[in-house]
């Protein structure tokens, strides 16, 4: 259940980030993979944040398929391009 909640939150975060991206960006993202940090805001720690820290969850935006040990968790947008979010 916690995993489902974490994945849902990551997906919503990716969609929210995509909606806030400025339109018409002229910069192109490099074709290399880029790591991103996921932060769960708020003054107090949440159970979801605590679970993510304990589990050591690290997510990356990947141009190709997810690496061994990672799962496709949604999509992320960098500089106007959409990538795979692998955690």
Swiss-Prot record:
The keyword Secreted applies. Highest expression in bone marrow and to a much lesser extent in small intestine. GO terms for cellular component: extracellular space. PROSITE patterns: DEFENSIN. It is found in: Secreted. GO terms for biological process: antibacterial humoral response; antimicrobial humoral immune response mediated by antimicrobial peptide; cellular response to lipopolysaccharide; defense response to fungus; defense response to Gram-negative bacterium; defense response to Gram-positive bacterium; disruption of plasma membrane integrity in another organism; innate immune response in mucosa. Disulfide bonds join 59-87, 61-76, 66-86. Pfam families: Defensin_1, Defensin_propep. Residues 20-58 form a propeptide. Keywords: Antibiotic, Antimicrobial, Defensin, Disulfide bond, Fungicide, Secreted, Signal. Residues 1-19 form the signal peptide. Belongs to the alpha-defensin family. PANTHER family: ALPHA-DEFENSIN 1 (PTHR11876), DEFENSIN ALPHA 10-RELATED (PTHR11876:SF31). Active in vitro against S.aureus, fungi, Gram-positive and Gram-negative bacteria and to a lesser extent against an enveloped virus. This is Neutrophil antibiotic peptide NP-3A.
